[in-house]
């Protein structure tokens, strides 16, 4: 048994001896297992946390890598784009340079061929002269000329035809862009600031909003309007763009007039509407013209206190009001601009079709026209010549338009004609500004309109003085009532506008006679026409004959138009002689001067050159100045003598025209026909013997 034990058995016995008892060993095993289990749980939780962090870190690194790759890709694309742009620019410059070189070569080739052609022509001439001098036969000369002609044809055939190439990089400006420039650069007459610049310094006390305009309180008006134009440019065609601009401006003006805000921006907005309307008449539809005319007439009626200024100052007024003018200036400008817009609307309507003209008018439009006419053409209040002129032009356009018969009746035109007769009874003069029987412009109304300028625009600087260029305000700057007097040139200018006003009234009556005929050719028309003609001729011969005025020719033209009107009304009336009983003698003398005052009936013993010198010496001086200028230009004595005779004949013709009050042959024949129908042949002979010295 002892032989069976070895060293391995001894090791096993020692290991068993060192082990604890079985119960104690089981407890230790269980506690060790629990400890190992807790440790494993804690290590598993920590491992999972580390795994999540590692995963998030890996995702972050992946995202950073992808973003870096995208950034590099974008940089590569941008560099490629820059290289492509540089390549295209270089290609364009190369093509332009090549094109210029080709043009230069073609020009040089053309010049060389032209020079060769000239040399061939000179060579031919020299050969022909040499053959003639040497006495060569004509056959040789013909052969040489044939050879030269063949060379010339060959040269002409070899010429390269040049064509104008198209510039593909040129950008053609569209209608909307032109309209935008037209609106942005708009300035009032005599003003240095654009209307948009003025509106940039004007604000509203309360906010206002339209379909495409949103204006906060205290903010300038110019920027929203400019932004609206920029948006419309890229969204709509020209006609729709103009309609939307007019609609939004009208809505904005209406909100200002109905609210409690100051009317500071109203005249500038109305002027902006006029500018939009005047860009291209063909792009404005009839319904837009109708809406704009109705809006302008309603707005003008709101300013009727300006049109109802009393003729005489009330003795009850103490005159202690402040000497400021800015608010009256704003209302005056708004009134002038409204009438200018109405006038432009009816003038554009003349270019439309007859159906469109009829569709323009309705009862509301016609009532507004009647109301505006009653306010502007009145004798109960002080007349404003700017407004009167616009109203007469509106009536002139209405007389040429095709209007509905139920609205444009003979009775309505009779009332309008009676107001025109009131204008005939008022002379045109600025000599006395307190005389209400004259048509004149007051110094406070010496402002330019949108269609015309009746004065010299002396007060135009006051419009810019309303604006504070360093701030944005809702009220205007203070303007005092201090107006300079009219100059002599300005008075002559206003007189000329007044004569044009009278001429426009005569044209209205002529047009109405063509339309209605005998219905309007009543006794009052004949009486007023004869009375006006006699007065104008007397004024021309007695007062204006020796006056140095540029309006004498216009007065003669007015007299000719009155003779035509008198003749047409005379032909339409059944018993015209009874209508002129009160002014018959004056009319006979007037017509006699027209018929027999021509140079063909002049006494041969008189000296017309002396009469012309006595009549208007200043005109003779102007002709002498022209003669001196012609002498400096022409050196030939024959030409100088011819020009001297022509200028002298022109001076005599002007003298004869002023003496007779008429120079047109047709007018003399019309006056002769009327004169013969007034008096008999025996009375004509007696009158001739009484008025012509033997």
From Swiss-Prot:
Protein species of origin: Eremothecium gossypii (strain ATCC 10895 / CBS 109.51 / FGSC 9923 / NRRL Y-1056) (Yeast)
Entry's localization field: Cytoplasm; Nucleus
Biological processes annotated in GO: chromatin organization; DNA damage checkpoint signaling; DNA repair; establishment of protein localization; telomere maintenance via telomerase
Alphabetic keyword roster: Chromatin regulator, Coiled coil, Cytoplasm, DNA damage, DNA repair, Nucleus, Phosphoprotein
Amino acid composition bias (Acidic residues), ranges on this chain: 1-13
Any Pfam family hit: LCD1
GO cellular component: ATR-ATRIP complex; cytoplasm; nuclear chromosome
Annotated protein name in UniProt: DNA damage checkpoint protein LCD1
GO MF terms, alphabetically ordered: damaged DNA binding
Stretches of the chain forming a coiled coil according to its record: 68-130
Lineage: Eukaryota, Fungi, Dikarya, Ascomycota, Saccharomycotina
Signal peptide region: none
Paired cysteines (S-S): none
Function according to Swiss-Prot or TrEMBL: Forms a complex with the serine/threonine kinase MEC1 which activates checkpoint signaling upon genotoxic stresses. The MEC1-LCD1 complex is recruited to DNA lesions in order to initiates the DNA repair by homologous recombination. Required for cell growth and meiotic recombination.
Location of region: Disordered: 1-26
Assembly with partners or alone: Forms a complex with MEC1.
